[in-house]
Amino acid sequence: MLMLLVRGTHYENLRSKVVLPTPLAGRSTETFVSEFPGPDTGIRWRRSDEALRVNVGGVRRQLSARALARFPGTRLGRLHAAASEEQARRLCDDYDEAAREFYFDRHPGFFLSLLHFYRTGHLHVLDELCVFAFGQEADYWGLGENALAACCRARYLERRLTQPHAWDEDSDTPSSVDPCPDEISDVQRELARYGAARCGRLRRRLWLTMENPGYSLPSKLFSCVSISVVLASIAAMCIHSLPEYQAREAAAAVAAVAAGRSPEGVRDDPVLRRLEYFCIAWFSFEVSSRLLLAPSTRNFFCHPLNLIDIVSVLPFYLTLLAGVALGDQGGKEFGHLGKVVQVFRLMRIFRVLKLARHSTGLRSLGATLKHSYREVGILLLYLAVGVSVFSGVAYTAEKEEDVGFNTIPACWWWGTVSMTTVGYGDVVPVTVAGKLAASGCILGGILVVALPITIIFNKFSHFYRRQKALEAAVRNSNHREFEDLLSSVDGVSEASLETSGETSQEGRSADLESQAPSEPPHPQRY
């Protein structure tokens, strides 16, 4: 179009821009407005009754103009009512002029639910999308929470207000049970630390042998020996508490004190003492080996299982230090040394926790307690309130009777064993009011304890299935696959592993584009 610059007054309307010439001096010119049509006058780029052809993530459909006119505020409704092609292109990702088709790079599953919304006027929640992804899709297509159907609105709002967790107790799908990619990347990052270390390949093999029982046959043998030593240590501790051993050691201790010698040298049975030394030597070997072979010393001391290993050998060495510190101060200090040694020996009970390294159930229990501190706190709060209330009622009803309800603190023990439905029977009410209070305490305990226990059990089931899936993945992988994994991280720096997430994400996006669904011969119409 030829454009002329004319000096004069400019007027602009919706159709065209008209320039009125300025009248020359001395001449009277009648002012008029041009009536010629603009370039788009009477010519629409789309017919108002034309069906809208869309392609969402490879899913092609045709939507009728009547269905879109019912919801003009949605993105497709605004696209249908667009006055120009330029305005329509701002609402979509791409436009095919030849096929007159609009393309959207969005979730195709939500688009099918969107088609159902244009038919019925109600939007239903998709289980395949999390609540936040579903909300983002709904906002993109111009749908608010009012568009949700009544059957899905309450569930959607509840999940949206609930803080997201790394697990879902109601889900048994492989995606929720299988190990997440973060765990695999953490293992690769730990293995990559050996790349620049001295004797890194040998240290890496030894570390996998000690940490992963399914790595090789020597790792399985090492795990069996470790379990046997832990069980032997626990058995020796239990046998040491038998009456015949206690009487024999007490007589030997009295004779040693009378002779002015330390009772610790003759207190233990020789066989049990040798077994204890062997167990301590094995535990010390495990701790020192894991510390020397660990890829990161800081991470070593932050791992709960490693802390348990340290606590299992700590009482023995503390006992030796106490003996060295108090051994030269005379027989009067031997009594204090014996008390200190008894306290340290009580810490040997923590050796049973070493089995958690070889037990799926114990590791799952630890993960459950770690993620259930709120539920455990609620359970303790419920029990504390119930015990306080029913203890006061029982004290009021039984204080005149000589049955053990003399004070309210004395009634706390009865309230605890009653609410937890243990019922030792050492203290029981005898009056009618006391028995009614006991009945209410027992029934209240059943109801109160059952509420958080269900949530904790669901979490335990989830973590147990997840741990079993991780062990199965390691067990099913053969030795050659482990060799490939080890060789793949040789020379790989930790920084490259941190940036690998972005590269893998781009690769997955490219794969999704290359695996787009095939085009149907004729798109369906709605």
Swiss-Prot record:
Alphabetic keyword roster: Cell membrane, Ion channel, Ion transport, Membrane, Potassium, Potassium channel, Potassium transport, Transmembrane, Transmembrane helix, Transport, Voltage-gated channel
Start-end of Polar residues biased regions: 496-507
Any GO MF annotation of the entry: potassium channel regulator activity
Broad class of where this protein is predominantly found: membrane
Subunit structure: Heterotetramer with KCNB1. Heterotetramer with KCNB2. Does not form homomultimers.
Family per similarity comment: Belongs to the potassium channel family. S (TC 1.A.1.2) subfamily. Kv9.1/KCNS1 sub-subfamily.
Protein name as annotated: Delayed-rectifier potassium channel regulatory subunit KCNS1
Lineage: Eukaryota, Metazoa, Chordata, Craniata, Vertebrata
Gene designation: KCNS1
